[in-house]
Each structure stands twice: as structure tokens, then as C-alpha cells.
């Protein structure tokens, strides 16, 4: 009976405030406030402790649902992007999920972490991002996992642009070199290139950036194909070079036809806009992450 009267003494206002702060249930908030003798800070700590205990049981359950979240600094010089996974698409569409993802992306652009672990060990306003994610797990009731993180920096004369496609299924960042102040044509070009990358998933920025092993493997395949056609060696070599050029146009960003204007390559479109594409990042939800 005593416990019931103690719970009754906790004001509805405090319970409501604690619920808004923590996302915990009404009775959990009442009990925590009672245990903390009405101290809101201590009650929050009690719920956090209990929430973390619940959250720990969910570790490893995040799947391929979630969102890609990107952010660009106010000066346009840095971009950050993360893939945050959840167990269900329902949770991935909540404001709480978006809030956590935005914090992670903002930290990525500000600190350029080289790994997920480095990102989660960062502190923002006195709170480790790892703890922020864990608290979100407790509040939302299912596991979250930061799958990968990236950072992109603009050249001294230039900026970073971002684009999120299909509600967070794909995210892109593009670094553009352009004269300052940046002209509208360069801004429009950056946006178009971001969307282009989302659609085409290029393997590299330029030929020089393609992994040698990938080019060598393609050359071997093309050599075998050309040789099987019984052509003279000098013709075979020309066929290989021609087919390699076609391969580069399919996988190299600067050589691809711009989706919005296929008659122009991305490189040519950038040149006409008085800009140059110098880097990009692309995340697609659930795809195999590079080691």
C-alpha cells in the first residue's frame, strides 16, 4: 500500500516531462521518479540504466532496414554521411531515428572519423555518440547499428553537395571545384551529378582511380572474347581497346553520359558549368560495404 501512495505523490506534470525526455512508459517514469524522490535528473539516470540493460539484449539484431543520412557544413566545405540500420522500416521512418542519424552525420562532417568505432567514440556536448545510440535503442525498442561512415572535403575553391534518394535508400556526396563566389550553374551541376551518381553507381571518378585488378580482369575477358572471333592480332588489339573504352564509359563517373543530358559526359557538363568534379561518395542501404 505504501508503494501505491508514494507513486500517487508524483505529479502528473513531472511524469509527462520525464516521458517526453526519455520516451519511457508512464508507469516506468512514475517508478523512477518515486525511487529518485522526485529528482528528475536522477530519475532519468535510473531509466537510462534500465534502458541500457534492455538495449544490451538487442545488440546484433539490426538488419538491412534503416536510412542513409547525409549532412553538409554551413560553409559547404565538408560533407558527412552514415548508414544507420534498424530492425524494421517503421522505426527507420520515425523522427527519433532521423534525429540520431543527423547527429551522426553532423559528427562525421565535423571530425572526419576513419571508422564507425572512431565515430561512436566521439563526444558531442559531453555525450558519447555510442551512448546516444544506445539510449535511442532503449527508447525505440529495437536495435540500431551504424554500418558505415564517410567524409568528403571540398577543395580550397569549391564546395560539397549532397543528395538523398528514395527516403534514405541511397545517399551521395559530391566535391566540386569552382570559382568563389559559386555561380548558380555550378550549384545546379553539383545537384545533377549527385542525382546521377545515385542512379548509375559509378565505380570511380576517373580511369586512374579504377583498381588495377578490375581493369586487368576486364582486359582478360575482352581479350578472350576478341581472340575467339578469329581476328588478326592487330585487329584483336584494336577491338580490345575499343571495348575497354566502352567499359570505362560505363563505370567511370567523368566519362559517363549525364543522366539528365546523355549527349554530354559528366566531365563535359562540369566544364560547361565552370566547375570540376573532384570526388564523390555513394551509399546504398544494405549493399555490401567496402572493407
Please identify what each model-predicted range represents.
Residues 2-291:
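N-terminal assembly/interaction segments in proteins that build large macromolecular machines
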Amino acid at each position: 500500500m505504501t508503494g501505491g501512495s508514494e507513486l500517487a505523490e508524483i505529479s502528473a506534470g513531472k511524469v509527462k516531462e520525464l516521458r517526453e525526455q526519455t520516451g519511457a512508459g508512464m508507469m516506468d517514469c512514475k517508478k523512477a521518479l518515486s525511487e529518485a524522490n522526485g529528482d528528475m535528473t536522477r530519475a532519468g539516470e535510473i531509466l537510462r540504466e534500465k534502458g541500457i540493460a534492455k538495449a544490451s539484449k538487442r545488440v546484433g539484431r539490426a538488419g538491412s532496414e534503416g536510412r542513409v543520412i547525409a549532412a553538409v557544413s554551413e560553409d559547404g566545405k565538408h560533407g558527412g554521411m552514415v548508414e544507420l540500420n534498424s530492425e524494421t522500416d517503421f522505426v527507420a521512418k520515425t523522427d527519433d531515428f532521423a534525429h540520431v542519424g543527423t547527429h551522426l552525420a553532423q559528427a562525421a562532417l565535423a571530425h572526419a572519423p576513419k571508422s564507425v568505432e572512431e565515430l561512436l567514440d566521439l563526444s558531442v556536448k559531453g555525450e558519447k555518440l555510442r551512448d546516444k545510440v544506445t539510449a535511442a535503442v532503449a527508447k525505440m525498442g529495437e536495435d540500431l547499428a551504424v554500418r558505415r561512415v564517410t567524409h568528403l572535403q571540398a577543395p580550397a575553391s569549391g564546395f560539397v553537395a549532397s543528395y538523398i534518394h528514395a527516403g534514405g535508400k541511397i545517399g551521395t556526396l559530391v566535391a566540386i571545384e569552382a570559382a568563389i563566389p559559386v555561380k548558380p550553374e555550378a550549384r545546379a551541376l553539383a545537384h545533377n551529378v549527385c542525382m546521377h551518381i545515385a542512379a548509375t553507381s559509378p565505380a570511380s571518378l576517373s580511369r586512374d582511380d579504377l583498381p588495377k585488378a578490375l581493369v586487368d580482369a576486364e582486359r582478360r575477358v575482352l581479350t578472350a572474347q576478341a581472340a575467339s572471333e578469329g581476328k588478326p592480332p592487330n585487329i584483336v588489339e584494336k577491338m580490345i581497346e575499343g571495348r575497354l573504352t566502352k567499359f570505362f564509359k560505363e563505370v567511370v563517373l567523368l566519362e559517363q553520359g549525364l543522366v539528365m543530358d546523355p549527349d554530354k559526359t559528366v566531365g563535359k557538363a562540369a566544364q560547361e558549368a565552370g566547375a570540376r568534379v573532384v570526388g564523390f561518395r555513394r551509399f546504398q542501404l544494405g549493399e555490401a560495404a567496402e572493407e
